[in-house]
Amino acid sequence: MRSKPDWLKVKMPTGDTFYQMRNLMKLYKLNTVCEEAACPNVGECWNKKHATVMILGSTCTRACAFCNVATGIPDKLDPHEPQNLAKAINSLKLHHVVITSVDRDDLPDGGAGHFVECIEEIRKRDDNITIEILTPDFLNKHGAIDKIAAVAPDVYNHNVETVPRLYARIRPKARYFHSLYLLKAVKYKNPKIFTKSGIMVGLGETKEEIYQVMDDLRSADVDFITIGQYLQPTPKHAVVDRYVTPEEFDHYKYVAYSKGFLMVASGPLVRSSYHAEEDFQKLKQNRTAMLMRAESNSI
């Protein structure tokens, strides 16, 4: 495994709030992608009481070459998970929550119904909490998209992860254009939902391929794009092709805004839910400003 440049080195997680968060997740038997995927930002985020909860168990039915989450035959769904999630959020007094999941290709709806139950349970306790969900592709199972659009999370996120040319090696069980369809369908069925997608760089893609992904996401009416450095979790995972410089990330950010995204997060340590609460507020402000400009131009 290649040594990391200085701009990717982070401090070991510590602090009272960090341990409080970890203990609370254990108390309510909740999984987090922060731990399962070995996110480099876990210390910073947990000390701010930001966490991305991972529902539908801790075992994924796929084995993507970039992901550190365990794969295999998953356990049965925990019927108490929605209630436990809502209790934990209430205990932490969160204002914005991010929910993601493993892939559950074994379930009839891919797990979409469980996302709905979690969202409804959270809103029963506090309907002022804003909710962002990061979902798998549900294997294009019937009714999954309708369920998600109907429950209306504030932000719907589904990551394309990499450029189409690398899918066979990096995401062999996924299809790039199905991911685009999923994002476009959610926006079409409920235009009020902010849509979001992310891509990793440093896997061997070219700049031109990144620009094409940006264009494809804008064609799918995606509002928010995240761009971050791929980091190899273990020697068994896909090898890092190169470390993209902070200056290149700044360039990607400039290009993405020029293509019409409402919000862009681009940097070496950017992940799907990094600074999610702050970015959601900026996203709302940017949409309001865009609508005001459009109204002004129509007068």
From Swiss-Prot:
The lineage of its organism: Bacteria, Pseudomonadati, Pseudomonadota, Alphaproteobacteria, Rickettsiales. It is an enzyme of class 2 (transferase). [4Fe-4S] cluster 1 binds at C34, C39, C45, S273. It comes from the Bacteria. One of its GO terms (molecular function) is lipoate synthase activity. Gene3D superfamilies: Aldolase class I (3.20.20.70). [4Fe-4S] cluster 2 binds at C60, C64, C67. This is Lipoyl synthase. Keywords: 4Fe-4S, Cytoplasm, Iron, Iron-sulfur, Metal-binding, S-adenosyl-L-methionine, Transferase. Its cofactor is [4Fe-4S] cluster. Its EC number is 2.8.1.8. Its main location: cytoplasm. It comes from Ehrlichia canis (strain Jake). It catalyses: [[Fe-S] cluster scaffold protein carrying a second [4Fe-4S](2+) cluster] + N(6)-octanoyl-L-lysyl-[protein] + 2 oxidized [2Fe-2S]-[ferredoxin] + 2 S-adenosyl-L-methionine + 4 H(+) = [[Fe-S] cluster scaffold protein] + N(6)-[(R)-dihydrolipoyl]-L-lysyl-[protein] + 4 Fe(3+) + 2 hydrogen sulfide + 2 5'-deoxyadenosine + 2 L-methionine + 2 reduced [2Fe-2S]-[ferredoxin].
